[in-house]
Regions:
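Intrinsically disordered, low-complexity Pro/Gly/Ser/Thr-rich segments with frequent PxxP/GP/PP motifs
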Residues: 219-226, 670-705, 766-790
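Beta-strand-rich binding/interaction modules
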Residues: 60, 73-75, 188-216, 648-686, ...
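Terminal connector regions
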Residues: 248-261, 272, 699-735, 789-812
Length: 812
């Protein structure tokens, strides 16, 4: 039995044990295995605090914002509560339990693994379910973030801890909730109404930056309000409402007319105050029968939206570690490449207030799954009641956010039952959990958030096959979990592709963290030294940090279809990330050429630990090659080139735009050896918002496919296509490159030969690139944006590694 050790709150026990040297860092090497004994342990946290009953406030509450997960709370040696839900706060009235002076607080956590197994055994006996029933293990019976039990991109670290803040609240009366509703008139006027849940015997006075109301109820009539839009469609205008809770004997009629003076008067007498930010907007989910099936299309403020974004997983294996700063960095990275929507995946969390506030500010719509994923769940009795309570708490917390666009019952549970995942013989006799998604959650939303769209599962389409593509949304995994070659993305018939992805290696910086580069000796059992890190891609540690369940040789073979065989870990990082980029480019261009697809949400934006995965940005914050390509793929104006046996076609498409796209476009064949133009066509064009057009057809006869690049240009828009596989190309040798850094965060680079997929890396970790992984079809000077100190750079393209010559003067 361990003695008492120092602990951090908020925190998780694994983090404390690492800090105290009891276990090794589970993110390094293969240490995950050696840490899993902690999952089966009971853990206690204790502290003591001074309390002086000097306050005039008659009520005192102890509030835990997050407890992970099954625990009992003791105050001064007496159990005062039990809790079993990571997603719901716990608030306890301790007005009569606190003592003057020193108070002792203890929280005792049971093992979520052992509790889940025990409940499962009882439930299976009651239901008469065989032990071999698939997708119904211990995680289904504990309301805890499901990814912590391990996923195909994350470790199994079923931790415990006080994962969100704890506070002692003293009050006379409180505003518990403010719900702001919007009524939109046909002429564009909007009425805001604030409905407050507050203690009896008080009055609520609400101020907004658009108007004033004395008393609870109507806030403001706005004849021409500034609306909130997702990124790319308009501004993210937010209005702040401030609610004041005042005694019943307060004379509201005496409030000054001047707003500042009135608020100062209220602040002096208020028993409580709460601020709420709202954005004026409408969001609808259109699902209409048509000749293709049934649509799945978001409409914001009456305008059709092509949703462009990604799936979001928790940003750390131990969610107590996720900071507002880290959230901002990831979310700004999403906006930087033109995303307008994120899907908060059902195996994770209801995210923190910080997350939704940042999405409001950045214009990122949120598709919010309720936290159920890839499993069956009990759906009646105590479990159903707990889910209802959890949902009520979180719907109230999140419903005022303009970024919140959709509630979804679960991730893939419906299609899991339809397709008998785990085998027909191991499928349960009914869809366990269905009552939650069809009854419990819709009823909560009807009561608390009736205006926001809801779907019971994702994907959700046809009655027999919810993942058919022609109806509803689709998770298109036929490539990664099926045919392997990314060219098959062109077979998807999705109306809305809410999950699809292609995995790749994390960055060398992430690998350095895995191999614990700070140590001095070679790693036991690893074929690398810490100072060189030229690891074999088949090294056991490298393989351990691949949870894709694909079989590592298959993973390698997917890249080998197109790229040379990697000889070093650095080769694998480079080639696998290019292959991921190619895959997502193929898919996104296909979806945006489609006449009926209205959304693309890539799996996945982020990682929770250093791993090879589908992420666009790894755990070290390093964008992969695909991330840089997304700026082009998510732009309103998109060019794409498709190849047939005898010709290439140039396609144009326009989405999320307020005006037509007009101009002159060219499609050229360029020599990869010299950069000279071999053949070219051009045309005038005009494309309306939502329109797709084929504008040019270039003959390919007589071209050397191994040494030709197709280049399309129109203003700032461009597209490239190779006629041969990258591993078959004839390229100019890797010549030195001249680079210069200016004070505005711009790197100028001069190339003397064409370069395909030039990637700059920073061995010192001092540079963050905003532009990278570029193709330069002709010799010249290119400007790339960066942040940080421009030193210690390395460069490689498909031709090989390029020496860099740093110049003190600008190149242009």
């Amino acid at each position: 039995m361990l003695e008492w050790l120092p602990a951090r709150v908020p925190g998780h026990v694994h983090l404390d044990l690492v800090e105290q040297g009891v276990i090794a860092d589970p993110f390094e090497r293969m240490n995950e295995l050696g840490c899993q004994w902690v999952d089966d342990q009971e853990v206690s946290y204790r502290t003591q605090f001074e309390f002086s009953p000097d306050s005039a406030a008659p009520h005192r509450a102890l509030r835990f914002e997050g407890l992970d997960t099954v625990c009992q709370v003791f105050l001064n040696g007496e159990q005062i509560a039990a809790h079993e839900n990571m997603f719901a706060p716990l608030e306890l009235d301790v007005s009569e339990r606190l003592v003057s002076g020193l108070n002792r607080l203890e929280v005792r956590f049971d093992s979520a693994v052992r509790v889940g197994k025990a409940i499962r055994a009882r439930y299976f006996a009651e239901q008469g379910l065989p032990e071999t029933t698939a997708r119904f293990d211990e995680r289904s019976f504990v309301r805890k973030a499901q990814y912590m039990y391990g996923w195909d991109w994350g470790p199994r670290l079923v931790s415990a801890g006080i994962w969100r803040p704890v506070s002692l609240i003293e009050y006379a009366a409180r505003i518990r909730d403010v719900h702001v509703t919007q009524s939109h008139a046909p002429n564009g006027a909007v009425r805001l109404d604030a409905h407050s849940d507050a203690d009896a015997g008080v009055l609520v006075h609400v101020f907004s930056d658009a108007g004033v109301c004395v008393g609870d109820g109507q806030v403001a009539d706005l004849p021409k309000p500034e609306r909130w839009y997702p990124h790319g469609l308009g501004p993210q205008t937010l209005h702040t409402l401030t609610s004041y809770l005042c005694p019943l004997d307060f004379d509201a009629a005496s409030l000054p007319v001047d707003r500042s003076a009135a608020e100062a008067r209220l602040a002096a007498v208020a028993l409580d105050r709460r601020t709420t930010r709202v954005g004026i907007r409408t969001v609808r989910l259109l699902q209409k029968e048509d000749s293709f099936g049934r649509s799945f299309e978001f409409e914001v403020n009456g305008e059709s939206l092509f949703a462009l974004g990604a799936n979001w997983i928790p940003g750390h294996s131990f969610p107590s570690r996720i900071s507002r700063r880290a959230l901002r960095e990831r979310l700004e990275s999403a906006r930087e490449v033109g995303m307008n929507m994120l899907r908060v995946w059902g195996g994770g969390l209801y995210e923190s207030d910080d997350f939704y506030e940042l999405c409001d500010e950045l214009g990122l719509l949120v598709w919010q799954d309720f936290p159920f994923a890839c499993a069956y769940y009990p759906d009646t009795g105590e479990f159903g009641a707990a889910v209802r309570e959890e949902a009520c708490v979180n719907v109230r917390r999140l419903r005022n956010h303009p970024s919140l666009a959709l509630w979804c019952g679960n991730n893939e549970n419906e299609v899991m039952f339809q397709q008998s995942w785990g085998g027909e013989e191991h499928r349960p006799p009914r869809y366990y959990g269905e009552h939650l998604y069809d009854q419990v959650l819709p009823q909560v939303l009807l009561e608390l958030d009736p205006e926001r769209p809801y779907v019971p599962s994702s994907p959700h389409g046809g009655e027999k096959d919810g993942n058919s593509g022609g109806v509803g949304d689709q998770h298109y995994w036929d490539v990664w979990h099926g045919r392997g070659d990314w060219q098959h993305y062109r077979d998807s018939s999705a109306r809305f592709s809410s999950e699809y992805g292609f995995a790749s290696s994390c960055s060398m910086r992430a690998w350095r963290s895995v191999f614990a580069e700070h140590a001095r000796d070679a790693l036991p059992g690893a074929s690398v030294t810490l100072h060189d890190l030229r690891a074999s891609v088949r090294d056991p540690i490298v393989r351990w940090h691949d949870k894709t369940a694909k079989g590592y040789e298959v993973f390698l073979s997917y890249a080998a279809l197109h790229y040379p065989e990697p000889q070093t870990l650095e080769d694998w990082v480079y080639y696998s990330q290019l292959n991921q980029r190619d895959a997502l480019r193929c898919a996104l261009e296909h979806y945006r050429r489609s006449a009926f697809c209205k959304g693309s949400l890539i799996w996945q934006l982020n990682d929770c630990w250093p791993v090879q995965s589908w992420a666009l940005i790894d755990s070290e914050g390093q964008p992969k090659s695909a991330w840089f390509e997304l700026r082009r793929l998510h732009a309103p104006e998109l060019m794409s080139i498709t190849l047939a046996a005898a010709h290439a076609e140039l396609h144009l498409g326009l989405d999320n735009a307020r005006s037509d796209w007009r101009g002159n476009v060219s499609l050229s064949a360029v020599s990869l050896l010299t950069g000279s133009e071999v053949r070219s066509l051009n045309a005038e064009f005009s494309v309306a918002n939502g329109e797709r057009r084929n504008v040019l057809r270039l003959p390919l006869e007589g071209l050397n496919q191994r040494s030709t690049l197709l280049v399309a240009n129109c203003g700032s828009s461009s597209a490239y296509a190779l006629l041969a596989e990258p591993k078959e190309l004839e390229l100019a040798s890797a010549e030195p490159l001249s680079v210069s850094f200016d004070t505005d965060g711009v790197l100028e680079l001069r190339n003397t030969t064409p370069l395909i997929d030039l990637v700059l890396t920073d061995a010192r970790g001092t540079v963050a690139f905003l532009d990278n992984c570029v193709t330069l079809p002709r010799p010249g000077v290119t400007r790339l944006r960066y942040r940080g100190q421009g030193h210690g750079l390395e460069a490689r393209s498909l031709a090989g590694r390029h020496p860099l010559r740093a110049l003190a003067t600008r190149l242009i």
